[in-house]
Amino acid sequence: MRMRLVLAFVSLLTTTGLAQTPPQDNQTVKVGPWTVATTYEADKFNHCTMSSSAEDLGISFVRDQDELSLVLDSSKWKLERGKAYSVRLVAGSQSIEAKALAQAKSVTIALTDRPFNGKLRIANALEVRGEGATLHVPLVGSAAALERLEACFDKNERESTETNPFVAPSRKP
């Protein structure tokens, strides 16, 4: 009797602990040279990332509820934290002006132009042209990886949305 009670208690603790942790399946997936990962903060979905590297350049595309962003980092950089550097992004025959927001060793570039983002899916490379240099960002295999990034975001955003089962959902056009 005592053994059954102990086993039941251990089972309850294990089940409760598993129910409180975010889902562990498919949190990191390799898609060609890219790694697509899910990030949680305080047990809530935060964003999905698609990462790779080329020489000393770290490359990450981050998809959160607001936008798609490109994060570039290098241990060789010495940037002015908080500064917004003007850059020109070139993918194939299309280019746009953007701002690269700096940290000490990285920059974040918001990718808000939908037609340009579509071009990223089919381009072999992205050029990030700054005043001092042009960075060559290889995009080999990025079409499939970007699709997986969007699927990661859609799936986790849908699953993390808090709902009230006792009221009708709001209808939005």
Model-inferred region functions:
Residues 19-173:
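A generic "folded-domain core" signal
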